[in-house]
């Protein structure tokens, strides 16, 4: 039996879906269940093995569409700079190494060949590289990609104004070309193999599914589908998953309440296809009981259907994290992508207001995203740089325990992994009474404050509610009691307990 987990892309700053897969991978490892994680985006900015290892995946768990048709293994970048220099005879060809200013890129230049070769360090200390760029007459013409060997090359048109990739080669271990991807510049592509051509990425994906040769005891967990305009993967999986069982996790609010009434429902567009084809789905998995009950009632009302819906948290805790010392007094932490929908600006404004009463109050904001500069400007505008800080991207598992309280401004979380990790470190919690994460991890007056929320309220009213809760939390609340309640809530999210829920579902599906 193998569990195939279907995704599209992954990066250094991943979303909740990738983190959910990472937690699931850990649960499956604990159960000794064979699991594969399938990615189909063209991921060349970094070695996919490095990106997935960053989230705790094992390299042998990863299947990447573009690598699948070669015999090169998914593996870390271990190719040495010295090996590259030697193999390409750079010294004999009289290439000179230009002074390096400490960046990840080196420049080898030949005036005679009018060529600059730019290897990029993957790890400067280990002297390993993951990319090499070739610039001829000041124009990019080629880029090679390395793990333990060269696995791909992309070739550019070399034009002055519209220099774009015209084809890519993907290699086998012995250096032979496994296949070539041709691009016409208008979004069309052709994958040329020695014995066959595939005229779209969708066709190539279909061939990969065919080669998986699904068995009756296999399970496919479809985490993401159809965000890539070059690929229609969701429909393909619905069409070709048999005899395996198909499971659909719901990672977000699954419908739009503004356009839903007794006569119609507007499903979240990322899940509409999956909900309308419920006959093909062995089970839906949601993160909270509240979402399970709502989805079940909507399926019954609108589709006259009664599909199997299981509650399994998308995250889990290896263990409860107790503070190694004294928690920093009057300290707030929040962690998320720096995106508009997270409403971190409300949290900043609330902290500024509360700071007037709790004078040693601090807020540390963890995460990266497109809103970073705007949020920094807001902090500076409020003269709050001394007590509100953007901390960047970090592994927070052992960071939460340094703080007293977690605060969330988000008004919609399918689950809220950072909320789970915060209660697992015993923090008191502040957030709005909105589906589904806050309602799961905040018990009002017991481990924090679950604040009333109406969308139509002004931002200043929402900010004031948060500010009042901050002040109350640090001036009136029994934080020791709040911290103990958070630890108690977190018990059911320990990996060993979540793994049992997966084990039960998989057992049911195998015997269905």
UniProtKB/Swiss-Prot annotation:
GO terms for molecular function: glycosyltransferase activity; nucleotide binding. It holds the Pfam family GtfA_EBD. It is found in: Cytoplasm; Cell membrane. Transmembrane segments: none annotated. UDP binds at residues 16-19, 393-394, 413-416. GO terms for cellular component: cytoplasm; plasma membrane; protein N-acetylglucosaminyltransferase complex. It is an enzyme of class 2 (transferase). N-acetyl-D-glucosamine binds at residue 251. Pathway: Protein modification; protein glycosylation. GO terms for biological process: protein O-linked glycosylation via serine. It is a peripheral membrane protein. Signal peptide: none annotated. It catalyses: L-seryl-[protein] + UDP-N-acetyl-alpha-D-glucosamine = 3-O-[N-acetyl-alpha-D-glucosaminyl]-L-seryl-[protein] + UDP + H(+). InterPro entries: GtfA, GtfA_EBD. Its main location: cytoplasm. Its EC number is 2.4.1.-. Required for polymorphic O-glycosylation of the serine-rich repeat protein (SRRP) in this bacteria. Catalyzes the first step in glycosylation by transferring N-acetylglucosamine from UDP-GlcNAc to serine residues in the substrate protein. Part of the accessory SecA2/SecY2 system specifically required to export serine-rich repeat cell wall proteins encoded in the same operon. The GtfA-GtfB complex adds GlcNAc from UDP-GlcNAc to SRRP (experimentally characterized with a truncated SSR1 construct); the alpha linkage was shown for this enzyme but not the residues glycosylated on SRRP. Belongs to the glycosyltransferase group 1 family. Glycosyltransferase 4 subfamily. Forms a heterotetramer with 2 subunits each of GtfA and GtfB. Part of the accessory SecA2/SecY2 protein translocation apparatus. This is UDP-N-acetylglucosamine--peptide N-acetylglucosaminyltransferase GtfA subunit. It comes from Limosilactobacillus reuteri subsp. suis (strain ATCC 53608 / LMG 31752 / 1063) (Lactobacillus reuteri).
């Amino acid at each position: 039996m193998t569990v195939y987990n279907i995704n599209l892309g992954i990066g250094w700053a991943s979303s909740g879906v990738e983190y959910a897969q990472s937690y699931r991978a850990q649960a499956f490892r604990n159960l000794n269940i064979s699991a594969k994680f399938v990615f189909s985006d063209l991921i060349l900015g970094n070695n996919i093995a490095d990106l997935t290892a960053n989230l705790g995946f094992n390299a042998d768990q990863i299947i990447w569409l573009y690598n699948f048709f070669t015999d090169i293994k998914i593996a870390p970048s271990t190719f040495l700079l010295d090996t590259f220099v030697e193999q390409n005879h750079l010294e004999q060809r009289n290439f000179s190494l230009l002074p390096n200013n400490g960046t990840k890129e080196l420049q080898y230049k030949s005036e005679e060949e009018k060529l600059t070769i730019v290897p990029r360090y993957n790890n400067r200390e280990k002297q390993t590289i993951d990319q090499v760029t070739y610039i001829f007459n000041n124009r990019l013409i080629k880029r090679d990609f390395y793990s333990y060997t060269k696995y791909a090359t992309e070739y550019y048109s070399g034009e002055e104004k519209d220099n774009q990739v015209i084809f890519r080669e993907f290699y086998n271990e012995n250096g032979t070309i496994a296949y070539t991807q041709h691009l016409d510049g208008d979004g069309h592509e052709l994958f040329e193999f020695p014995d066959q051509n595939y005229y779209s990425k969708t066709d190539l994906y279909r061939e990969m599914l065919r080669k998986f040769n699904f068995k009756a005891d296999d399970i496919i967990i479809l985490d993401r589908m159809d965000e890539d305009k070059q690929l229609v993967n969701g429909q393909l999986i619905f069409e070709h998953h048999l005899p395996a069982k198909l499971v659909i996790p719901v990672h977000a609010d699954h419908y739009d309440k503004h356009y839903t009434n007794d006569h119609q429902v507007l499903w979240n567009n990322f899940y509409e296809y999956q909900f309308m084809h419920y006959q093909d789905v062995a089970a839906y998995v949601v993160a909270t009981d509240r979402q399970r009950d709502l989805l079940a009632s909507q399926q019954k009302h609108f589709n006259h259907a009664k599909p199997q819906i299981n509650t399994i948290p998308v995250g889990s805790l290896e263990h409860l994290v107790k503070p190694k010392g004294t928690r920093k007094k009057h300290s707030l932490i929040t962690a998320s992508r720096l995106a508009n929908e997270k409403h971190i600006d409300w949290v900043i404004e609330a902290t500024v207001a509360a700071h007037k009463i709790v004078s040693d109050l601090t807020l540390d904001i963890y995460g990266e995203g497109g809103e970073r500069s705007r949020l920094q400007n807001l902090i500076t505008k409020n003269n709050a740089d001394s007590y509100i800080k953007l901390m960047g991207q970090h592994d927070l598992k052992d960071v939460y325990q340094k703080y007293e309280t977690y605060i969330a401004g988000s008004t919609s979380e399918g689950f809220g992994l950072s909320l789970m990790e915060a209660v697992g470190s015993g923090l008191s919690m502040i957030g709005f009474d909105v589906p589904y994460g806050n309602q799961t991890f905040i018990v009002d007056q017991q481990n924090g404050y679950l604040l009333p929320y109406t969308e139509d309220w002004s931002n200043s009213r929402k900010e004031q509610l948060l500010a009042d809760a901050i002040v109350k939390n640090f001036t009136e609340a029994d934080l020791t009691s709040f911290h103990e309640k958070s630890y108690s809530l977190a018990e059911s999210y320990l990996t060993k307990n979540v793994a049992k829920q997966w084990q039960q579902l998989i057992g049911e599906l195998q015997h269905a």
